[in-house]
């Protein structure tokens, strides 16, 4: 076994600024304060770092700066993010997968218009051309993920808002599966999401959903999009540019589910999959974002 084999995962080029990450990304464009692109071998491949740390580097915020100049500078920054190809991140993709026997998983693929998550995170300088809203990235790999807390929240909201819907799913499973009849939905909710009546070691755990594949031929997985709020009918609406995950990107939803309580771990997994396909996840689901298919 070599010294490389003995290194922990965080020494294998997964953190922003690590040597192996730099080597893989020598030709990535970076915009200086003049708006020109330059090749810099110190640019990390960590997209989260690009979005939250490097994004405003080199932008001259001073009185008299023209809107058109800001737009040109941010266009270069935006392109450096949206032209990233998923095939350039094999180590990061492998690190996010949890291939253990104790993990239950299923994979779903984004549909048009895509997925947005983390919009509430601050990301704005009130200048022309920038991405105005936040986005959620895994801190270590820099790839988009759906936090386990968000997955848990969406699933629980289905129990709270529509117990009859949950009851219907349990009583009407896909073909060749056994219906679950006469179950207390309120008790099932508390058992799954609060661990009520269960030992801490026997409670269900909701893990981050991670990207495993991209279905686009060019391996792109991020893109710009716009929303146009109408806060006042007498004012012209101002489009807001934001970042999204493209359609045809496959996410793996991962859980550590226990065979304890009212239904089995396999029953919970199948239930969760049907809920997510029906309701979607992330921001702007009311206008079509966050929808998935098998």
Sequence positions of predicted segments:
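Basic, Gly/Ser/Thr-rich N-terminal segments that form RNA-phosphate-binding interfaces in CRISPR RAMP
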Residues: 1-294
